[in-house]
Amino acid sequence: MDIKKKIRRKIELYNFKRNHRGLYVDGSLQLRLPKYISCGSNIAIGENSKLLCWDSYNGKKFETSPSIIIESGVRITRNLTIQCANRVQIGDNVLIASDVFIIDYNHGNSPLTKNYRDNPLNISVGGVTIENGVWIGNNVIILPNVTIGEKSIVGAGSVVTKSIPAYSVAVGNPAHVIKHFDFEANIWIED
């Protein structure tokens, strides 16, 4: 990375932290188009994390702007990557473990183009919503058009391809619900 890019990145990170009081971020946080990122208070984002917004691809501007929203009390361990061309919303008091990848769009896959890079991004598939109090385990991948319901747990190594109801435990590739919380018995019950 050349010196101009390093300086620009430091200034961008400084301004981002200044505009979001109560935000702790490691100096290695990478931002792309931070004007599309909003954060609540009392948030910690660990080292080597990336919040990347895309408002165009291959020189074509999208009709809508991307949006990453991180609510208050969120804790992110390290190595989180969010790729956003639509909308990613993370609710209050969410815990995200290491090496999590969240993406809200699909890449085109037509073999009729010269190469896959020339395919347009499909941003109409739907965003990602992680509701309040969710716990995301290590090495989880969250794909577009899903909602992870309030106080749910996603087990380590899971790939979330469809929505997960509130107060559930989901694991696997693809992730599937294995438990739900029974409020009458006050325990987790296997499905």
Predicted feature locations:
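Mobile, glycine-enriched helix-loop/loop "lid" segments at the mouths of ligand-binding/catalytic clefts
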Residues: 109-118, 186-190
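Conserved catalytic-core motifs of eukaryotic protein kinase domains, centered on the activation segment
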Residues: 106-108, 113-114, 146, 180-181
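A short, glycine- and basic residue-enriched loop/turn
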Residues: 88, 127-128, 145-146, 161, ...
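A generic "structured core" feature
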Residues: 135, 151-153, 158-159
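Domain-scale signature associated with acetyltransferase and cell-envelope carbohydrate enzymes
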Residues: 1-104, 131-133, 140, 150, ...
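A short acidic, glycine-rich active-site loop
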Residues: 117-128
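Conserved beta-strand->loop/alpha-helix structural units within folded catalytic cores of enzymes
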Residues: 138, 143-144, 156
